[in-house]
Structures are given as C-alpha cells and as structure tokens.
Amino acid sequence: MASFQDRAQHTIAQLDKELSKYPVLNNLERQTSVPKVYVILGLGGIYTFLVFFNIAGQLLVNLAGFILPTYYSLDALFSAGKADDTQWLTYWVVYAFFTVVESAISAPYWFPFYYIFKFALVLWLALPQTNGAQIVFKSLVQPLVGRYFTGGSTSANLRAQADAATKSQ
C-alpha cells in the first residue's frame, strides 16, 4: 500500500501533466521558477481561505459560478452538437433558481459558512462529470415549474412521447 506522501506526489505529477496543457502556466513557471502546480495550489488555498472567512466570499463564489460556466456555454453555442447546449442551459436555469432562493431567504445571514457550501454546490452543479445541474433540475425545478411548460411546448411533448415509448418497451 502506497504511503500518503507517495499518493500526494503521484497526484501532483498528474496535476502538473494536466496543467502543462496551458501555455500561460508554462510561461509563468519559466519566468518565476515556481512550479505551476504550487502556484495553482497556492492560489486555490488563498481562494478557499478567503471564501471560508467570507472575505469577499459572495463575489468569489459568484465568479466561480459565472466565469467557467460562461466559457463553456459560449463554447457550446459555437459547437455543432446540442447535448452540451442542453447541459449548460440547464446549469443556468438551476443557478438562477438558487440565486433567487438565496436572495429571498437571506441565506448568508441564516447559515454560517454559507459561501463554502455554495462554492461546493456551484462546483457540483457546473462540473459535467457530476451532472449536478441535471439532477437538481429533474428532482426540484422541473416538478415545481414543469406543469407550466409541458402543455404548449413542442419539445416537451416530444420528450414525453419519447419517455413513454422507452417505458413501454
């Protein structure tokens, strides 16, 4: 069984390999002589510290929920496929839903360390590997507002017919 140090070194090596794909980070490493892995881990640590102690927590978490999803949404709009369009449209609907609920109940006032939990939620919602936005949409948003859209929507009717056809088989 590998020791913790061996596993940490392996993870750092994998992260370094992944970060090597970005020329900006390679240039930064050459200019500063600081390994790009340590720069990213340091910035991530500072970011987490600021969010944890709510030093601009709202701004930092909203940036996390906005910058990367916006990039991927624009990428999806310029791609030929439609699956990624649906994924990011679902993300934005769920993100907007949570933003409205957050404002309505003054969540940061009532929940300690709210922005740490929101950051984890935003990551879970946004990462395609987790399908968080689709899970929340199908289990929470769709039951609440779906009945207002299914009757007149052609895509909803087609979706219902496809679901019925797959269930009958």
Swiss-Prot record:
Q: Give its localization.
A: Endoplasmic reticulum membrane; Golgi apparatus membrane
Q: Which GO terms describe its cellular component?
A: endoplasmic reticulum membrane; Golgi membrane
**What residue ranges lie in the Lumenal compartment?**
56, 104-105
Transmembrane region positions? 36-55, 57-76, 89-103, 106-124
User: What InterPro entries does the entry give?
Assistant: TB2_DP1_HVA22 (IPR004345)
User: Which residues pair up as cystines?
Assistant: none
Query: What domain of life is recorded for the organism?
Result: Eukaryota
- Please list the residue ranges that the record places on the Cytoplasmic side of the membrane: 1-35, 77-88, 125-169
> What membrane topology does the annotation report for this chain?
Multi-pass membrane protein
One Pfam annotation, family name?
A: TB2_DP1_HVA22
Note whether Secreted occurs among the keywords.
Answer: no
Which key words are in the record? Endoplasmic reticulum, Golgi apparatus, Membrane, Transmembrane, Transmembrane helix
**Domain comment (free text):** The short lumenal loops between transmembrane domains 1 and 2 and between transmembrane domains 3 and 4 may impart a wedge-like configuration, thus deforming membranes.
Free-text function comment from the UniProt entry? Required to generate and maintain the structure of the tubular endoplasmic reticulum network and the vacuole. Induces high curvature in membranes and causes membrane tubule formation. Involved in membrane/vesicle trafficking.
Q: Which family does it belong to?
A: Belongs to the DP1 family.
Assembly description: Oligomer.
Which PANTHER family did the record assign? HVA22-LIKE PROTEINS, RECEPTOR EXPRESSION-ENHANCING PROTEIN
Q: What is this protein called?
A: Protein yop1
Source organism phylogeny = Eukaryota, Fungi, Dikarya, Ascomycota, Pezizomycotina
As recorded in Swiss-Prot or TrEMBL, the protein's gene is named yop1
